[in-house]
């Protein structure tokens, strides 16, 4: 990408992108290098924008970035972002910044009533369940319990099906997938449930293995959010 000649695509109507957020997110705060590291690909998006000169553009990144990074991006893209949480549409908390010149309604919809219970599959195979003992269960909390095993706290969290799940991340395995309490037992969310949490059709990613499905979906955008932003284009 750093050597691509974007002028050959000049005249396209729409440019979309989202550079890797690893060096912007608070999840990686201890490694933060602002707009360097993997996130420096943002500057390639800027170059593409300048060389292609599309009618519209959309750039997405994490809402947990620091103010310095946010202002640099805003200055180079020539607009301020709108913060949209996917929980306005799906059963996932996923706050993101969106920079765009698309003239859409910037009043963010309220949080939707959809919870994990509304997207969970029935008859989930045993391979998705864990046999680790659980800490005390509190059904009044979003994270209602933790699995008892030696791992990072965030990987031991078990979500209450009556709430929304935390942000999906790009993981392949190692018990890092989001977990839910199902029939008194902890299990990882299935790939289909991940798809539903991003607004994708069931089995949309079924052509690849589970590990790649989790990673791809966690790296993606929430379909409903993008549709909300794009809906004004149908009248343009």
List PLM regions with ranges.
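Conserved active-site and SAM-binding loop architecture
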Residues: 1-236
């Amino acid at each position: 990408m750093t050597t691509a000649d974007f002028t050959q695509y000049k005249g396209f109507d729409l440019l979309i992108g989202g550079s890797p957020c690893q060096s912007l997110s608070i999840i990686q705060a201890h490694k933060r290098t602002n707009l360097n590291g993997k996130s420096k690909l943002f500057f390639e998006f800027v170059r593409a924008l300048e060389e292609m000169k599309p009618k519209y553009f959309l750039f997405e990144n994490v809402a947990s970035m620091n103010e310095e990074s946010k202002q640099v991006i805003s200055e180079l893209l020539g607009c301020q972002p709108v913060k949209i949480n996917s929980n306005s549409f799906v059963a996932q908390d996923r706050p993101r910044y969106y920079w765009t010149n698309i003239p859409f309604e910037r009043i963010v919809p309220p949080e939707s009533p959809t919870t994990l219970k509304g997207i969970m599959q029935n008859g989930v195979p045993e391979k998705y369940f864990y046999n680790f003992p659980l800490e005390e269960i509190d059904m009044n909390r979003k994270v209602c319990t933790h699995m008892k095993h030696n791992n990072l706290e965030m990987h031991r969290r078990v979500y209450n099906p009556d709430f929304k799940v935390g942000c999906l991340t790009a993981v392949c395995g190692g018990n890092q997938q989001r977990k839910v309490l199902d029939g008194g037992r902890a299990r990882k969310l299935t790939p289909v449930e991940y798809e539903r949490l991003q607004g994708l059709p069931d089995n949309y990613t079924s052509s690849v293995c589970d590990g790649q499905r989790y990673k791809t979906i966690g790296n993606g955008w929430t379909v409903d959010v993008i549709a909300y932003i794009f809906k004004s284009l149908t009248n343009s």
